[in-house]
Amino acid sequence: AEFDALPRLLGRATVEIRTSQGDLTAVIDGYSAPLTGGAFVDLVERGFYDGLPFSRAEDFYVLQSGNPKGNAEGFIDPKTKQERHVPLEILVPGDTSPIYNMTFEDLGLFKATPVLPFATLGTLGWAHSDKALDDGSSQFFFFLYEAELTPAGLNLVDGRNAAFGYVVEGSEVLKEMTMDDTIISAKVISGSENLKSHA
């Protein structure tokens, strides 16, 4: 199939992210986002995120990281020498497998909430460019949910970006972070056996 060469997470994994503001623990949900979760856990295991800075995109209330040093904007796969891209991956409630490279708008789902919604502080999302849905490679963001700024069901990222996990410890650290902060290290503390390098 089309995405067989991509890593996948068949289950859950727990990742500890040490930052210059403090430590976060995140659970990555490969049941609902196998390719996105797989790409993230694979990059964590490669040490890709260690030392990378944060950038902030105010309009979405997110704190973003994963842009490598140098000219590349994503992860260059040493095997192919190309930037590895992950398709937009969203699981619609009631479906058994995710839909790829279609926003909820494309699907006409204007009121639907994905199985993994951007509904809490510290939801992990996968970034892609404005130009394409399938060019996300390594950049991810923490959703900085604020109820008064994000009326239920009206945030702009549900159905447009893949959520792939949640911060379960350290969400107060997120509130303190700025663009001056960095990821010191990220490591998988459980569930690494659920990572498969391809289909």
Regions found by a protein language model. Give the residues of each.
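Cyclophilin-like peptidyl-prolyl cis-trans isomerases
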Residues: 1-199
